[in-house]
């Protein structure tokens, strides 16, 4: 008797996606940080756009625009805190992602590793421009 999950057309799709997944069986939770980085980046971009709609960078009105965001904008305080804490979470996930790469020897793949190092420097430069310089 043949196995139904390997012969039925719809069950074959489910089988190849969930049951016989072509992934190593020893994959751990350390491999989730790439997707967590993507989620943190999307949160940063969206909250940054909403904050930029109400922020004024003029030295005379910058503080009052931040208080306007926190007091007058609907859930502005939440957007501001999500943006601030999302940046911290982004860098925690980023450093854990790099640490996982070091632990599992991903530096042996030179082209991929060098692109990752360039991305790390670009992220750090962007964070410097957005946090330290204003």
UniProtKB/Swiss-Prot annotation:
UniProt-annotated location(s) = Mitochondrion inner membrane
What sections of the sequence does the record tag as coiled-coil? none
Q: GO BP, one example? A: mitochondrial electron transport, ubiquinol to cytochrome c
Highest taxon in the source lineage: Eukaryota
Which residues are recorded as binding heme b b566? 97
| Residues annotated as binding heme b b562 | 83
Keyword list, A-Z: Electron transport, Heme, Iron, Membrane, Metal-binding, Mitochondrion, Mitochondrion inner membrane, Respiratory chain, Transmembrane, Transmembrane helix, Transport, Ubiquinone
Q: State its cofactor.
A: heme b
Q: How is the cofactor bound?
A: Binds 2 heme b groups non-covalently.
Provide the transmembrane region boundaries.
33-53, 77-98, 113-133
The Gene Ontology terms for molecular function here are: metal ion binding; ubiquinol-cytochrome-c reductase activity
Under the heading CDD domains, the entry gives: Cytochrome_b_N (cd00284)
Q: Write out the GO cellular component annotations.
A: mitochondrial inner membrane
Q: What PROSITE patterns has UniProt attached to this entry? A: CYTB_NTER
Q: Which InterPro entries does the entry link to?
A: Cyt_b/b6_N, Cytb/b6-like_sf, Cytochrome_b_N_euk/bac, Di-haem_cyt_TM
What's its membrane topology? Multi-pass membrane protein
Instruction: Just give the chief location class.
Output: mitochondrion
Record carries keyword Electron transport: yes
Q: Subunit composition?
A: The cytochrome bc1 complex contains 11 subunits: 3 respiratory subunits (MT-CYB, CYC1 and UQCRFS1), 2 core proteins (UQCRC1 and UQCRC2) and 6 low-molecular weight proteins (UQCRH/QCR6, UQCRB/QCR7, UQCRQ/QCR8, UQCR10/QCR9, UQCR11/QCR10 and a cleavage product of UQCRFS1). This cytochrome bc1 complex then forms a dimer.
Reported function: Component of the ubiquinol-cytochrome c reductase complex (complex III or cytochrome b-c1 complex) that is part of the mitochondrial respiratory chain. The b-c1 complex mediates electron transfer from ubiquinol to cytochrome c. Contributes to the generation of a proton gradient across the mitochondrial membrane that is then used for ATP synthesis.
Please share what else the UniProt entry notes about this protein.
Answer: Heme 1 (or BL or b562) is low-potential and absorbs at about 562 nm, and heme 2 (or BH or b566) is high-potential and absorbs at about 566 nm.
Q: Give the family this protein belongs to, as stated in its UniProt record.
A: Belongs to the cytochrome b family.
What is the name listed in the Swiss-Prot or TrEMBL entry for this protein?
A: Cytochrome b
